[in-house]
UniProtKB/Swiss-Prot annotation:
<dbReference type="InterPro" id="IPR007502">
    <property type="entry name" value="Helicase-assoc_dom"/>
</dbReference>
<comment type="similarity">
    <text>Belongs to the DEAD box helicase family. DEAH subfamily. DDX15/PRP43 sub-subfamily.</text>
</comment>
<dbReference type="GO" id="GO:0005524">
    <property type="term" value="F:ATP binding"/>
</dbReference>
<dbReference type="GO" id="GO:0004386">
    <property type="term" value="F:helicase activity"/>
</dbReference>
<dbReference type="GO" id="GO:0008380">
    <property type="term" value="P:RNA splicing"/>
</dbReference>
<dbReference type="InterPro" id="IPR001650">
    <property type="entry name" value="Helicase_C-like"/>
</dbReference>
<dbReference type="GO" id="GO:0003723">
    <property type="term" value="F:RNA binding"/>
</dbReference>
<dbReference type="GO" id="GO:0005681">
    <property type="term" value="C:spliceosomal complex"/>
</dbReference>
<keyword id="KW-0507">mRNA processing</keyword>
<dbReference type="Pfam" id="PF21010">
    <property type="entry name" value="HA2_C"/>
</dbReference>
<dbReference type="InterPro" id="IPR027417">
    <property type="entry name" value="P-loop_NTPase"/>
</dbReference>
<dbReference type="InterPro" id="IPR014001">
    <property type="entry name" value="Helicase_ATP-bd"/>
</dbReference>
<dbReference type="Pfam" id="PF00271">
    <property type="entry name" value="Helicase_C"/>
</dbReference>
<dbReference type="GO" id="GO:0016887">
    <property type="term" value="F:ATP hydrolysis activity"/>
</dbReference>
<keyword id="KW-0347">Helicase</keyword>
<dbReference type="InterPro" id="IPR002464">
    <property type="entry name" value="DNA/RNA_helicase_DEAH_CS"/>
</dbReference>
<dbReference type="InterPro" id="IPR048333">
    <property type="entry name" value="HA2_WH"/>
</dbReference>
Amino acid sequence: IKYMTDGMLLREGMTDPLLERYGVILLDEAHERTVATDILMGLLKEVEKQRSDLKLVVMSATLDAGKFQHYFDNAPLMTVPGRTHPVEIFYTPEPERDYLEAAIRTVVQIHMCEEVEGDVLLFLTGQEEIEEACKRIKREVDNLGPEVGDLKTIPLYSTLPPAMQQRIFEHAPPNKANGAIGRKVVVSTNIAETSLTIDGVVFVIDPGFAKQKVYNPRIRVESLLVSPISKASAQQRVGRAGRTRPGKCFRLYTEKAYDSEMQDNTYPEILRSNLGTVVLQLKKLGIDDLVHFDFMDPPAPETLMRALELLNYLGALDDSGDLTRLGSMMAEFPLDPQLAKMVIASTDYSCSNEILSVTAMLSVPQCFLRPNEAKKLADEAKMRFAHIDGDHLTLLNVYHAFKQNNEDPQWCYDNFIQYRSLKSADSVRQQLARIMDRFALQRTSTNFNSKDYYL
């Protein structure tokens, strides 16, 4: 059995179009509809026509089964009953004007009024919101007086250091002598929807929002916007409350909003992304007729045209829309097309080692930490790495300092640097260097003391 990401399987398809080495392929969490999953489903549908021995299993806890069955030519459906406990769902009678305020109020009410022991999981949209909520919840509970049980607030988001993320598995504070219940409240982004299970959670608070990537093809900008979640995501959140015993879910929106305003499933990523990488991968896979490629949800023609224009401008496609030698090399790099072109072109400017480091740093989460309790110290530490010519050279300074200090986690801690991001960047850099070596692209650096260095 081989476990891999959908992106890895897609890369294998570039060298082995029929995926001959596999007899059974399972696509899990298909409801998330990532770009790689959507392309894979289109490819595997074609592969199945040529390989009668291949078995394809598409799995999900909250799948729009009918749509997937129809896409795969009325494939059979197998349902496995879940073993979750019953969860009582509550809605607000009126729409909430300020979901953050309502969420904090709900946490405090649960802690004060619920007579059942159990922890609380609150979903919010991002780091700033989560830190603000943790601070305000703690302040409000501390002001309630000694007769109320202790409440431990724990933030959870992807850029949090691993040691801090492990806090979600800590036990709740003990009950007081007067019987007041001690609880913990985990305030998380939507990574707690499917990625992990937190034992002890009985109460879930769902404001109904998450950050989603949105792409505007006209101005060619991707941004993260706070958007309403889908019914599928809402059901995933409900399921978090019934993992170990019966629970309650407090939805901070009306039942009418759930029934008539929410989409059934999350808007597929392929419909809200820059398709430059997608088009490059499909061209590398030998698929030239992009308009008729069997996407489950075809992207807008304008988005496809913008991607083709970009790749032509970068030299990855010729004027006929065919893949060039440069484009074929770019497709091998697991990067956005602009970054892939930059890495390949860096050999002509004798700076490929530096560009590898910058590209690796751009490919991992934010490396600068700025904890609430030490913002001034963190800003001062960041300024020590700052470069007058901008963020890219600032990131290069951080990477160089990390290597010069022997990748020391303590050095990262002292300088408010995210150790995990730097280790990831180091791995990405090694991977990119191996791809460069495969294409015999020379890795060079200009001597810092050379008079040509700043030309």
